[in-house]
């Protein structure tokens, strides 16, 4: 009898554990129809996923011959970062092409006819419809042959993807010659100087890295000369900034780096992506974060939090006052503005303890999705 109860208890605990793991690690296989062809992808929902949050989406494409599961497990695992930074990670699956390769198809003279552009377009629509994802914050990255595909997406889907990231791949010459993006797009590129697959200085098929950077700087109408920052470990970051909408071109050069997915790639890519919407970014002098940079409680935008901010909030509420950032007035971050917000600010000022919801005390973007306007704010 004791053994029976023990087994029952063990089963109950296992069920609880399984439920907890299912809630914290939601990997969902999905399919989508692309012109009569069934395409597969896997969706990772971050912990405590709520469709009301309208999260951004990062599509991650592996190298040639790799399944999405392999890329997720052994190279581009974005799941911990998705939990921490609140985004949905998607791992698309390539099709077996006419040459027997589980490879992504690139547009151009060597195309196998597989519609990868339509695949991305269909996945974006599905993520918006099925998970209420934010259509303004769709991002894609790829490694090796998956990285080569990103150049097609940058050229063909700049009005769908806010930014793309490319690791260990340069543009094919034919991709550049046919590239006419509908609008500027954020570009972040990671490449080693000893990469055998994507030669840093180009070859008969791919363009040199400096030519590629100049091309995208021209597309984004940035400054012609980049800033240069050492990242340590032989890595140097070059950034072309100050284009319209602050669309940036960023290039990480890895001195003596080979054809690999570097360990810093996930964080570097997301740091870049997280600034973007389709309309712009927050990188470079004079640029504000894409969702509107502000400091919660700093209602008058003077860079500090004091009694005048509470007064400004009350004037806004009851006397027709104007503010440049409604999100800054939302002191309790509940997505609405009322007397409770002024009370929250006053409580922080005079209680001597506690804090306000982020972004606070530093300036930043609002991680809470709401209808409050803060896009034209210049307070920080």
Annotate each predicted stretch with a short phrase.
Residues 4-16:
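Sec-dependent N-terminal signal peptides
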Residues 27-48, 52-139, 148, 152, ...:
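Serine-hydrolase catalytic machinery in alpha/beta-hydrolase-like enzymes
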Residues 194-198, 259-260:
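Acidic catalytic loop of the alpha/beta-hydrolase fold
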Residues 282-380:
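Cellulosome-associated attachment modules in secreted, modular CAZymes
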């Amino acid at each position: 009898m004791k053994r029976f109860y023990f087994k029952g208890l063990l089963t109950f605990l296992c069920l609880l554990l399984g439920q907890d793991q299912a809630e914290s690690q939601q990997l969902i296989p999905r399919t989508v129809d692309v012109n009569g062809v069934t395409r597969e992808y896997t969706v990772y929902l971050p912990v405590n996923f709520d469709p009301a949050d309208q999260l951004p989406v990062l599509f991650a494409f592996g190298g040639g011959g790799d399944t999405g599961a392999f890329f997720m497990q052994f190279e581009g695992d974005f799941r911990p970062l998705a939990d921490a930074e609140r985004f949905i990670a998607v791992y698309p699956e390539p099709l077996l092409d006419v040459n027997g390769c589980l490879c992504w198809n690139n547009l151009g003279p060597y195309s196998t006819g597989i519609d990868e552009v339509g695949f991305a377009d269909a996945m974006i629509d599905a993520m918006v419809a099925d998970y209420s994802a934010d259509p303004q914050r769709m991002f894609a990255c790829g490694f090796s042959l998956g990285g080569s595909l990103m150049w097609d997406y940058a050229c063909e889907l700049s009005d769908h993807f806010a930014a793309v990231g490319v690791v260990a791949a340069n543009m094919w010459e034919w991709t550049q010659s046919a590239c006419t993006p509908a609008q500027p797009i954020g570009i972040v590129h990671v490449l080693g100087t000893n990469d055998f697959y994507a030669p840093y200085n180009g070859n008969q098929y791919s363009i040199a890295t400096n030519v590629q950077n100049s091309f995208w700087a021209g597309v984004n109408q940035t400054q012609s000369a980049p800033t240069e920052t050492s990242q340590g470990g032989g890595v140097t970051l070059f950034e072309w900034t100050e284009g319209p909408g602050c669309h940036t071109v960023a290039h990480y050069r890895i001195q003596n780096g080979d054809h690999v997915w570097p360990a810093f790639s996930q964080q570097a890519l997301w740091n870049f992506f997280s600034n973007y919407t389709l309309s712009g970014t927050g990188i470079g002098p004079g640029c504000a974060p894409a969702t509107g940079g502000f400091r919660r409680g700093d209602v008058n935008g003077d860079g500090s939090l004091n009694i005048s901010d509470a007064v400004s909030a009350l004037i806004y509420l009851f006397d027709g006052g104007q503010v440049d950032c409604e999100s800054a007035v939302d002191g309790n971050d509940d997505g609405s503005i009322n007397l409770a917000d002024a009370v929250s600010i006053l409580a922080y000022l005079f209680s001597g303890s506690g804090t306000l919801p982020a972004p606070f005390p530093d300036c930043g973007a609002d991680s809470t999705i709401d209808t409050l306007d803060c896009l034209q704010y210049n307070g920080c």
